[in-house]
Swiss-Prot record:
Protein name per the record: Uncharacterized protein AF_0773
Species this protein is from: Archaeoglobus fulgidus (strain ATCC 49558 / DSM 4304 / JCM 9628 / NBRC 100126 / VC-16)
Length: 62
């Protein structure tokens, strides 16, 4: 099953909290997250720690 959770926040902690909250409200337990980080969030990528496997994709020029 695939579910999309996103945040438009530029603050890494606020963005993580919003995405984590959405993930907790799913009808299933995720086993993988693919996180696309814009340049503003890349320096704080360590904030995005979930209880499942996570793949970070760094985006430039956005």
């Amino acid at each position: 099953m695939i579910e999309f959770a996103y945040s438009l926040k530029n603050d890494p902690k606020k963005a993580f909290d919003e995405i984590r909250s959405k993930a907790e409200n799913l009808d299933f337990r995720p086993n993988l997250a693919i996180v696309y980080l814009t340049e503003h969030l890349q320096k704080d990528a360590k904030v995005f720690k979930f209880d499942f496997d996570t793949l970070w994709c760094l985006l430039k020029g956005l």
